[in-house]
């Protein structure tokens, strides 16, 4: 147990940290540092640590005036002196080596973060974690230099997360709609950088841009009671300061590493793109226009750190007739290769590699080529692939009867195959290259609450744990 130092605290109430912050003075920390050093050399002695801490305090009082605030470095120098003067050379050596080790860690963190001094948040994260933050998440200027600290990162994310709560405030929100259709006033978010606050947290231009976007959405739903000008005026009056606690709560969750959001949120919240979702699905229709539009949309999503799932089953099979040119189609797998190359290009410039889920229905004429598409892991390296097993496939498997493959362009059968051989091929390829996976159309849609209104689900996110309709 630590001794009660309240009677010997002297006139020191504050201490200056290396980053310039002034915090309450705690002699117990001096005692603990000495005790750990003694423990490191096999001479753990709590009473000795307490006695030496008192000597350090006494020396500090003699060397420092009442008007001065002692520094961490100054106190640590005195600890070394006291340890040596009192004959505890082994403990002094351990303490000195520990100081040196900590100094080396601080220097490396300063270099990684491009800072002169690390702060209390930098101390929460080890060197490897800070390297990841610096490489992926901290904002940089056009020269690639870091212009944001981890503390600033977590603050901008926490503020962004809290913004929607403002719109559900009783003074703002009209749940059942029917509110006046307010004019969407012009607002240049760049001119109001850091001009509005929620408590101590200032809103940057990208927070304000997100705020205006949310406001417009609620106005279109007729759920906002006040005009945009009145809404901003509430900031000036400090009305929204009550949401500061929500920001602090989320901020503390992140810096304590109890919870960290996904990459898009860390990169984009309070930043240019603003996108926080990681999982998307896009539709692909049987036309070159649709395919290229989807390719462009996927590239934009990858740029912001998201991933995309697609079902390529609407694309006509390889060799099928193309009316506009009189030629033949290249098939879904060749177009998947185009998406794969695009993903490879984007991943070199983005915050992380892109991720794709390519799905093909089991009754597509190119299903056998699809199953073998990742054989030897030589192609489609930026894709997970899965076969959507249709209910008829299992019926044919059980009854050992031919399974029809359907041309998606005409809706007519063009070939029959042995379903059991197809299943064997699928199982072998999953063993050989861990691809493809399987999705069960009947099970997915058996519990789909939107089946009657929106139809079946036939696509998933890149990791396949989230079932989504196209363009979700």
Which role does the model predict for each range below?
Residues 1-472:
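Extended catalytic cores of very large enzyme megasubunits
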